């Protein structure tokens, strides 16, 4: 079966697409990889050393004045002046 001759522009586009794919695959191959067991150990280490106060049974409650999110929430509130609600409908 004779190979059909493609116009040069289409050949160039095919070559460019192939080169882009090749470069993408080279970048993916060069990316640092770790094994699943090392990733799990890293997650376990992170969760055992960083306190998560969303789980008070494990880490306890935050000390007063330690929660910087609460301070910013109090500063943002004076706009409406309503305690216990998020907005005021007029």
UniProtKB/Swiss-Prot annotation:
Residues the record lists as Cysteine methyl ester modifications: 87
GO terms for biological process, alphabetical: G protein-coupled receptor signaling pathway; pheromone-dependent signal transduction involved in conjugation with cellular fusion
Subunit structure: G proteins are composed of 3 units, alpha, beta and gamma.
Annotated lipid attachment (S-palmitoyl cysteine): 86
InterPro entries, per the entry: G-protein_gamma-like_dom, GGL_sf, Ste18_fungal
Cellular component, GO annotation: heterotrimeric G-protein complex
Biological classification of the source: Eukaryota, Fungi, Dikarya, Ascomycota, Saccharomycotina
Propeptide section residues: 88-90
Family annotation (Pfam families): G-gamma
Keywords: Lipoprotein, Membrane, Methylation, Palmitate, Prenylation, Transducer
A single MF term (Gene Ontology): G-protein beta-subunit binding
The protein's name: Guanine nucleotide-binding protein subunit gamma
Membrane topology listed for this record: Peripheral membrane protein
TM region(s), chain numbering: none
Protein's cellular compartments: Membrane
Residues bearing a lipid moiety (S-farnesyl cysteine): 87
Similarity comment text for this entry: Belongs to the G protein gamma family.
């Amino acid at each position: 079966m004779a190979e059909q001759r493609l116009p040069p522009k289409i050949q160039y586009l095919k070559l460019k697409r192939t080169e882009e794919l090749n470069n993408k695959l080279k970048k993916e191959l060069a990316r640092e990889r770790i094994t699943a067991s090392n990733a799990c150990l890293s997650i376990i280490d992170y969760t055992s050393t960083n306190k998560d106060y969303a789980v008070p049974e494990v880490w306890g409650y935050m000390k007063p004045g330690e929660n910087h999110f609460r301070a910013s929430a109090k500063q943002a509130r004076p706009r409406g002046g309503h305690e216990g609600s998020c907005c005021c409908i007029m």
